[in-house]
Amino acid sequence: MENMLLWLIFFTPGWTLIDGSEMEWDFMWHLRKVPRIVSERTFHLTSPAFEADAKMMVNTVCGIECQKELPTPSLSELEDYLSYETVFENGTRTLTRVKVQDLVLEPTQNITTKGVSVRRKRQVYGTDSRFSILDKRFLTNFPFSTAVKLSTGCSGILISPQHVLTAAHCVHDGKDYVKGSKKLRVGLLKMRNKSGGKKRRGSKRSRREASGGDQREGTREHLRERAKGGRRRKKSGRGQRIAEGRPSFQWTRVKNTHIPKGWARGGMGDATLDYDYALLELKRAHKKKYMELGISPTIKKMPGGMIHFSGFDNDRADQLVYRFCSVSDESNDLLYQYCDAESGSTGSGVYLRLKDPDKKNWKRKIIAVYSGHQWVDVHGVQKDYNVAVRITPLKYAQICLWIHGNDANCAYG
């Protein structure tokens, strides 16, 4: 049943009917020239305290409805939000100021678009539509193999051989870095092998025999000890066979973390939900296939208005959970959606599958970061939504700068 469902999810053609009419047939990735973000100057800051409590929800934030009433940010404001902090594994911290070039400010910055009308409820809506990925044929292969788990309790996604994209609130509460983020680790799923990761015992014996053998060789006591050792090995072997085939995590330390100043405000105001994303650089590269970053299209350019993401929901211990759902509302920076999700899945990479215009095949790219279940200000009233932070051209340029260290490879996205 699971295999049939996943086949339908991943191989259904990219057309659908919504509200009785066919959506626009332009489901392709369109490369566009993006603004340049250039590092201007880097300052050393005092080391953070690492004392904040990890939060799965942000306190009251300005959501889509609230954004409609805001003026378009000026260039200097955007440069302030896109400047970024870097915290290193030894606890040191820097602030990098940036300049934005080749940006055309549009007067319709905060226009919003309605998607499919959906009944609003909390994190899980009626019948739970999440799917635990248990079959190792899917679990260890793309796209599911790109999902990772953070030691702070969130999820993330591989976007390069050495980088993970996640939500900023998973490592920083807007004022300070969360407890445990100084020694942050990322867990990559792998399958246990037959030996359980232990070395064979025969090597020690062969070395002993090569050096002249054991003085007790041939005695009754020695034979009895060898028999007991054999029984112990048989018992441990049974335990290894039980563990064989189950997924486990291979944990890797994080070398440094980048967070935009739009989120890491310190004492200079509240964190902005639009900038709830962070990039983690791993100490060592992985060998898995990663998912490329893309720029979020409008709802009309999403097949069926649907998005997909996988993460490690807390109510399903160490299971990778996949879901897909419709986007209900969008602004330039946020997506409201009603995917069933629990805490632990925040930080997951939200992706689409569109046509690659050059190769004419379908390709998945990350177009948002799942920020989680958030309380937002709607005309002075607090309402709860599931929110994802969109990858805009500016954010694409910033994350690309973080990955490559310069903007040479970030002209198009």
Swiss-Prot record:
Q: Which residues are glycosylated?
A: 90
The SS bond pairs are 154-170
Give start-end of the signal peptide.
Answer: 1-16
One GO CC annotation: extracellular region
The family annotation for this protein states: Belongs to the peptidase S1 family.
Note the PANTHER family from the entry.
INACTIVE SERINE PROTEASE 35, SERINE PROTEASE
Specify the protein name. Inactive serine protease 35
Q: Which organism is it from?
A: Homo sapiens
